[in-house]
Protein backbone atom coordinates (compact mmCIF):
# COMPACT_ATOMS: atom_id res chain seq x y z
CA UNK A 1 0.00 0.00 0.00
CA UNK A 2 1.28 3.47 -0.93
CA UNK A 3 2.13 5.58 2.09
CA UNK A 4 0.35 8.92 2.09
CA UNK A 5 2.39 12.06 2.66
CA UNK A 6 1.58 14.45 5.50
CA UNK A 7 0.38 17.00 2.94
CA UNK A 8 -2.06 14.55 1.35
CA UNK A 9 -3.33 13.41 4.76
CA UNK A 10 -3.89 17.03 5.76
CA UNK A 11 -5.90 17.66 2.59
CA UNK A 12 -8.00 14.54 3.07
CA UNK A 13 -8.77 15.52 6.65
CA UNK A 14 -10.23 18.85 5.50
CA UNK A 15 -12.47 17.57 2.71
CA UNK A 16 -15.60 15.53 3.37
CA UNK A 17 -16.02 13.53 0.15
CA UNK A 18 -19.67 12.83 0.93
CA UNK A 19 -20.62 16.47 1.43
CA UNK A 20 -21.88 18.99 -1.11
CA UNK A 21 -20.42 22.39 -0.24
CA UNK A 22 -21.94 25.80 -1.00
CA UNK A 23 -20.10 27.37 -3.95
CA UNK A 24 -18.12 29.98 -1.98
CA UNK A 25 -17.15 27.42 0.67
CA UNK A 26 -16.05 24.94 -2.00
CA UNK A 27 -13.79 27.49 -3.70
CA UNK A 28 -12.27 28.64 -0.42
CA UNK A 29 -11.64 25.03 0.59
CA UNK A 30 -9.96 24.20 -2.72
CA UNK A 31 -7.67 27.21 -2.35
CA UNK A 32 -6.89 26.20 1.23
CA UNK A 33 -5.95 22.68 0.10
CA UNK A 34 -3.73 23.91 -2.74
CA UNK A 35 -0.51 23.72 -0.72
CA UNK A 36 1.99 22.66 -3.40
CA UNK A 37 5.02 24.88 -4.00
CA UNK A 38 3.64 26.30 -7.24
CA UNK A 39 0.57 28.24 -8.33
CA UNK A 40 -1.76 25.28 -8.77
CA UNK A 41 -4.45 25.25 -11.43
CA UNK A 42 -8.03 25.34 -10.13
CA UNK A 43 -10.11 22.94 -12.19
CA UNK A 44 -13.74 21.96 -12.53
CA UNK A 45 -15.39 18.70 -13.57
CA UNK A 46 -19.02 18.83 -14.67
CA UNK A 47 -21.03 15.62 -15.06
CA UNK A 48 -23.62 16.15 -17.79
CA UNK A 49 -26.92 14.35 -18.23
CA UNK A 50 -26.18 13.18 -21.77
CA UNK A 51 -25.29 10.00 -23.62
CA UNK A 52 -21.79 10.83 -24.85
CA UNK A 53 -21.86 7.81 -27.18
CA UNK A 54 -24.52 9.47 -29.33
CA UNK A 55 -23.24 11.96 -31.90
CA UNK A 56 -26.22 14.28 -31.39
CA UNK A 57 -25.34 14.68 -27.71
CA UNK A 58 -21.70 15.74 -28.02
CA UNK A 59 -21.19 18.96 -26.06
CA UNK A 60 -18.41 21.17 -27.37
CA UNK A 61 -17.65 24.86 -27.39
CA UNK A 62 -15.57 27.71 -26.04
CA UNK A 63 -16.01 30.53 -23.55
CA UNK A 64 -13.96 33.58 -22.61
CA UNK A 65 -13.51 33.49 -18.83
CA UNK A 66 -14.16 37.00 -17.40
CA UNK A 67 -11.20 36.80 -15.00
CA UNK A 68 -8.87 35.09 -17.48
CA UNK A 69 -6.98 31.84 -16.98
CA UNK A 70 -3.78 33.07 -15.37
CA UNK A 71 -1.79 31.50 -18.19
CA UNK A 72 0.25 33.08 -20.98
CA UNK A 73 -1.10 31.60 -24.20
CA UNK A 74 0.97 31.40 -27.38
CA UNK A 75 -1.23 31.69 -30.47
CA UNK A 76 -0.44 30.56 -34.01
CA UNK A 77 -2.57 31.56 -37.00
CA UNK A 78 -2.91 30.28 -40.55
CA UNK A 79 -3.74 33.37 -42.58
CA UNK A 80 -2.47 35.39 -45.51
CA UNK A 81 -2.56 38.95 -46.77
CA UNK A 82 -4.64 41.41 -44.77
CA UNK A 83 -5.88 38.73 -42.36
CA UNK A 84 -2.28 37.81 -41.53
CA UNK A 85 -1.55 41.42 -40.67
CA UNK A 86 -4.69 41.61 -38.53
CA UNK A 87 -3.66 38.47 -36.64
CA UNK A 88 -0.21 39.92 -35.92
CA UNK A 89 -1.73 43.21 -34.76
CA UNK A 90 -4.06 41.29 -32.40
CA UNK A 91 -1.07 39.66 -30.70
CA UNK A 92 -0.50 36.32 -32.45
CA UNK A 93 3.05 35.06 -31.89
CA UNK A 94 3.16 32.98 -35.08
CA UNK A 95 1.46 33.71 -38.42
CA UNK A 96 2.10 31.80 -41.61
CA UNK A 97 1.04 29.44 -44.36
CA UNK A 98 3.12 26.72 -46.08
CA UNK A 99 6.22 27.36 -43.98
CA UNK A 100 4.20 27.07 -40.75
CA UNK A 101 2.64 23.84 -42.04
CA UNK A 102 6.08 22.36 -42.72
CA UNK A 103 7.25 23.29 -39.21
CA UNK A 104 4.23 21.54 -37.70
CA UNK A 105 4.78 18.44 -39.85
CA UNK A 106 8.36 18.41 -38.60
CA UNK A 107 7.17 18.35 -35.00
CA UNK A 108 7.83 22.00 -34.14
CA UNK A 109 4.73 23.00 -32.19
CA UNK A 110 5.55 25.95 -29.95
CA UNK A 111 2.02 27.29 -29.53
CA UNK A 112 -0.99 26.55 -27.32
CA UNK A 113 -3.83 27.46 -29.68
CA UNK A 114 -4.05 27.30 -33.47
CA UNK A 115 -6.47 29.52 -35.38
CA UNK A 116 -7.19 29.31 -39.11
CA UNK A 117 -8.94 31.47 -41.67
CA UNK A 118 -11.42 29.34 -43.69
CA UNK A 119 -9.48 29.87 -46.93
CA UNK A 120 -6.43 28.14 -45.41
CA UNK A 121 -8.15 24.88 -44.47
CA UNK A 122 -6.82 23.08 -47.55
CA UNK A 123 -3.37 23.38 -45.97
CA UNK A 124 -4.52 22.93 -42.37
CA UNK A 125 -6.49 19.82 -43.32
CA UNK A 126 -3.26 17.99 -44.15
CA UNK A 127 -2.09 18.41 -40.54
CA UNK A 128 -4.88 16.47 -38.85
CA UNK A 129 -2.73 13.50 -37.85
CA UNK A 130 -0.30 15.81 -36.07
CA UNK A 131 -2.73 18.33 -34.58
CA UNK A 132 -5.71 16.07 -33.80
CA UNK A 133 -4.11 13.93 -31.06
CA UNK A 134 -2.83 17.11 -29.39
CA UNK A 135 -6.24 18.76 -29.38
CA UNK A 136 -4.93 21.60 -31.55
CA UNK A 137 -6.89 21.07 -34.77
CA UNK A 138 -8.85 24.26 -35.59
CA UNK A 139 -12.62 23.81 -35.51
CA UNK A 140 -15.44 26.25 -36.30
CA UNK A 141 -17.47 24.92 -33.33
CA UNK A 142 -14.96 26.42 -30.89
CA UNK A 143 -14.26 29.54 -32.94
CA UNK A 144 -10.79 28.58 -34.15
CA UNK A 145 -11.81 28.41 -37.82
CA UNK A 146 -13.11 31.88 -38.54
CA UNK A 147 -12.78 34.73 -41.05
CA UNK A 148 -12.37 37.09 -38.08
CA UNK A 149 -8.94 35.86 -37.00
CA UNK A 150 -8.19 39.06 -35.08
CA UNK A 151 -11.11 38.57 -32.69
CA UNK A 152 -10.22 34.90 -32.27
CA UNK A 153 -6.67 35.86 -31.29
CA UNK A 154 -7.92 38.47 -28.83
CA UNK A 155 -10.32 35.96 -27.26
CA UNK A 156 -7.54 33.40 -26.87
CA UNK A 157 -5.33 36.00 -25.22
CA UNK A 158 -8.19 37.20 -22.99
CA UNK A 159 -8.68 33.78 -21.41
CA UNK A 160 -10.84 31.70 -23.71
CA UNK A 161 -11.06 28.02 -22.81
CA UNK A 162 -12.33 25.25 -25.03
CA UNK A 163 -14.43 22.43 -23.64
CA UNK A 164 -15.57 19.06 -24.91
CA UNK A 165 -17.41 16.30 -23.11
CA UNK A 166 -15.43 13.08 -22.66
CA UNK A 167 -16.65 9.50 -23.13
CA UNK A 168 -17.94 9.43 -19.55
CA UNK A 169 -20.12 12.51 -20.09
CA UNK A 170 -17.82 14.81 -18.10
CA UNK A 171 -16.44 18.21 -19.09
CA UNK A 172 -13.08 19.15 -17.58
CA UNK A 173 -11.77 22.73 -17.61
CA UNK A 174 -9.45 25.07 -15.76
CA UNK A 175 -11.07 28.14 -14.19
CA UNK A 176 -7.94 29.85 -12.88
CA UNK A 177 -5.08 29.55 -10.42
CA UNK A 178 -4.69 29.28 -6.66
CA UNK A 179 -3.53 32.93 -6.66
CA UNK A 180 -6.95 34.04 -7.97
CA UNK A 181 -9.40 35.61 -5.55
CA UNK A 182 -12.48 33.44 -4.82
CA UNK A 183 -14.69 35.99 -6.59
CA UNK A 184 -12.64 35.62 -9.78
CA UNK A 185 -12.87 31.83 -9.65
CA UNK A 186 -16.60 32.10 -9.04
CA UNK A 187 -17.17 34.38 -12.04
CA UNK A 188 -15.14 32.06 -14.27
CA UNK A 189 -17.04 28.97 -13.10
CA UNK A 190 -20.42 30.60 -13.64
CA UNK A 191 -19.36 31.72 -17.13
CA UNK A 192 -18.38 28.15 -17.98
CA UNK A 193 -21.67 26.74 -16.66
CA UNK A 194 -23.61 29.33 -18.67
CA UNK A 195 -21.73 28.27 -21.82
CA UNK A 196 -22.46 24.62 -21.07
CA UNK A 197 -26.16 25.40 -20.68
CA UNK A 198 -26.17 27.20 -24.04
CA UNK A 199 -24.50 24.15 -25.62
CA UNK A 200 -27.11 21.73 -24.24
CA UNK A 201 -28.11 19.24 -26.95
CA UNK A 202 -31.86 19.18 -27.76
CA UNK A 203 -31.76 15.39 -27.33
CA UNK A 204 -30.62 15.66 -23.70
CA UNK A 205 -33.39 14.68 -21.29
CA UNK A 206 -33.75 15.05 -17.54
CA UNK A 207 -31.20 16.85 -15.36
CA UNK A 208 -28.46 18.35 -17.55
CA UNK A 209 -25.90 19.68 -15.07
CA UNK A 210 -25.86 16.64 -12.80
CA UNK A 211 -22.73 17.13 -10.67
CA UNK A 212 -20.08 19.82 -10.29
CA UNK A 213 -16.78 19.38 -8.46
CA UNK A 214 -13.79 21.69 -8.12
CA UNK A 215 -10.20 20.74 -7.34
CA UNK A 216 -6.62 21.96 -7.58
CA UNK A 217 -3.76 20.30 -9.43
CA UNK A 218 -2.51 18.44 -6.36
CA UNK A 219 -5.61 18.68 -4.16
CA UNK A 220 -8.77 16.70 -3.49
CA UNK A 221 -12.05 17.14 -5.34
CA UNK A 222 -14.74 19.19 -3.59
CA UNK A 223 -18.35 18.65 -4.63
CA UNK A 224 -20.49 21.76 -5.10
CA UNK A 225 -24.09 22.07 -3.91
CA UNK A 226 -26.35 22.62 -6.92
CA UNK A 227 -28.69 24.97 -5.07
CA UNK A 228 -25.82 27.38 -4.38
CA UNK A 229 -24.95 27.40 -8.10
CA UNK A 230 -28.51 28.27 -9.06
CA UNK A 231 -28.60 31.03 -6.44
CA UNK A 232 -25.32 32.50 -7.70
CA UNK A 233 -26.26 32.44 -11.38
Curated annotation (Swiss-Prot):
Gene3D superfamilies: 3.30.190.20, 3.40.50.790. The keyword RNA-binding applies. This is Large ribosomal subunit protein uL1. One of its GO terms (cellular component) is cytosolic large ribosomal subunit. The keyword Ribonucleoprotein applies. GO terms for biological process: regulation of translation; translation. Binds directly to 23S rRNA. The L1 stalk is quite mobile in the ribosome, and is involved in E site tRNA release. Protein L1 is also a translational repressor protein, it controls the translation of the L11 operon by binding to its mRNA. PANTHER family: 54S RIBOSOMAL PROTEIN L1, MITOCHONDRIAL (PTHR36427), LARGE RIBOSOMAL SUBUNIT PROTEIN UL1M (PTHR36427:SF3).
